[in-house]
């Protein structure tokens, strides 16, 4: 499978870079590497839609200057690309997310992730905050659903924190395969990885649902998530901006949830809702 690597130069970089990631994510882009000049984004070559990209907000506003170049990369070349920039991430001095080539450190939870083209290493604000939520809440003996699992890192930490029954679901085949690899790499034995979307959810009820996707998918699927949540369960949502929190909360309240708290990092939000 061939991918396009698009190198975006953005001025000023923030918050435009974060906005561009969100917009490109809705166009099928799978992975992003941020840098001082902007970001590098990856999309399957046969899914790239130039017209749709040029119609997104950041290309139509004059608030930012954006230029880009592209080149074709084959799937196996991704390892060399992310290894150049992937540094270990320490969350709350308890959880280290690292690559196989990083040295192990003395932390409570050591997670080894080889992300390849998948989203979810802890570098992005949304993943970092969702990992923080897991560390701040009791997962012992809980059943957990990780929607849009990416690398599987959230489900992996949830199991390490005591969750006993877990499902990790992603619609992208690459993420599905990568999650299987990372689950095995971290010696997790209670995570079932599935390929698909919210339509896979049946009558199974969960104590905790984690969904780090994007605003539009969350708004569409919140009703389904609530139907799969046990009494006194918790729903953690991320992948949206602070200005979207009111809209997300209104949808959760519509289906019987109550807002409890949210974390915020660089205008990104990760919120907790409970029955």
Language-model segments: residues:
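Active-site beta-alpha loop architecture of Rossmann-like, nucleotide-cofactor-dependent enzymes
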Residues: 104, 120, 216
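Conserved SAM/SAH cofactor-binding pocket of Class I
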Residues: 117, 121-202
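A short hydrophobic/small-residue beta-strand
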Residues: 31, 165, 235-236
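N-terminal auxiliary segments of SAM/dcSAM-dependent transferases
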Residues: 2-106
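Short, well-ordered coil/turn elements that cap or connect secondary structure elements
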Residues: 63-65, 92, 106, 139, ...
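S-adenosylmethionine
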Residues: 171-275
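A short, charged helix-loop
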Residues: 109-115
């Amino acid at each position: 499978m061939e991918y396009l690597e698009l190198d975006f130069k953005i001025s000023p970089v923030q918050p435009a870079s974060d906005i561009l990631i969100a917009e490109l994510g809705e166009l099928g882009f799978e992975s992003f590497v941020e840098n001082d000049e902007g970001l590098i984004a990856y999309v399957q070559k046969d899914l790239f839609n130039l017209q749709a990209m040029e119609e997104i907000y950041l290309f139509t506003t004059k608030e930012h200057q954006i230029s880009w170049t592209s080149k074709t990369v084959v799937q196996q070349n991704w390892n060399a690309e992310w290894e150049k920039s992937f540094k270990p991430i320490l969350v709350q001095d308890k959880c280290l997310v690292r690559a196989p080539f990083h040295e192990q450190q003395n932390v409570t939870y050591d997670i080894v992730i080889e992300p390849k083209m998948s989203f979810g290493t802890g570098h992005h604000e949304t993943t970092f905050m969702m990992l923080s939520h897991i560390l701040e809440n009791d997962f012992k003996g809980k059943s957990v659903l990780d929607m849009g699992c990416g690398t599987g890192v959230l489900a992996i930490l949830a199991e390490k924190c005591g969750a006993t029954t877990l499902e990790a679901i992603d619609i992208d085949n690459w993420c599905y395969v990568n999650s299987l690899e990372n689950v095995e790499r971290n010696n997790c034995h209670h995570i079932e990885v599935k390929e698909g979307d919210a339509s896979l959810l049946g009558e199974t009820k969960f104590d905790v649902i984690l969904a780090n996707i994007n605003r539009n998918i969350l708004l569409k699927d919140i009703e389904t998530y609530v139907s799969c949540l046990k009494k006194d369960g918790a729903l953690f949502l991320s992948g949206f901006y602070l200005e979207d929190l009111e809209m997300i909360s209104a949808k959760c309240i519509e289906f019987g949830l109550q807002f409890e708290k949210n974390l915020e990092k660089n205008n990104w939000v990760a919120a907790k809702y409970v029955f």
